[in-house]
């Protein structure tokens, strides 16, 4: 997303969703890092806007992702969210409260990008691994598959539940395109061996 810029400075608005459980504690640490970053980069101006979302908000207002929060996320340059949902807080049909997945679907945040990098040899159980030896990127599709079937499952009998896993050409192609774009950017070395699995 683009941000408003004034001369050499830049101002970014971040919608902050602390969430539930350990979420607020994790968010406090993340905000401390952002505040320190602003001290180191005086031209960077961050406007942090707290927003209500999650299981606690569901209990309070009946909505895990209020319209005002969704609009704040839409208007922001970035969204920073922590853990959401509590095991004992359920919707009337028994499903957990998952506003983070609602956000993914609303904004089509289909890429789950998960880097894996070894910074220190002691961080790895692999005996010969040295810093930099482990450097890979995992991409996960975040909106299709079993995510698509939330609330659409079928219970034909009391002991059985059927679910639907959805994979579309559009969803697959956009993820593959993103994966190859990231591979071009990284391009540390050529792949020596690749394995393929049939996708049913």
Residue ranges and their predicted role:
Residues 15-32, 37-41, 157-199:
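Glycine-rich phosphate/diphosphate-binding loop of Rossmann-like nucleotide-binding domains
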């Amino acid at each position: 997303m683009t941000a408003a810029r004034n001369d050499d400075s830049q101002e970014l608005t971040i919608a902050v969703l602390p969430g539930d459980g350990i979420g607020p504690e994790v968010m406090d640490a993340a905000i401390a890092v952002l505040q320190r970053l602003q001290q180191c980069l005086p031209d960077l101006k961050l406007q942090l806007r707290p927003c209500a979302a999650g299981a606690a908000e569901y209990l309070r207002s009946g909505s895990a992702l209020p319209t005002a929060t969704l609009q704040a996320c839409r208007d922001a340059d970035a969204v920073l969210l922590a853990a959401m949902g509590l095991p004992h807080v359920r919707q009337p049909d028994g499903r957990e409260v998952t506003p983070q997945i609602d956000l993914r679907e609303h904004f089509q945040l289909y890429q789950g990008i998960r880097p894996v990098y070894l910074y220190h040899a002691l961080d790895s159980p692999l005996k010969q691994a040295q810093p930099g030896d482990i450097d890979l990127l995992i991409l996960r599709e975040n909106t299709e598959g079993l995510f698509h079937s939330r609330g659409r499952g079928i219970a034909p009998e009391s002991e059985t539940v059927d679910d639907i896993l959805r994979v579309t050409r559009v969803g697959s192609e956009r993820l593959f395109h993103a994966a190859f774009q990231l591979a071009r950017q990284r391009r540390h070395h050529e792949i020596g061996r690749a394995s393929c699995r049939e996708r049913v």
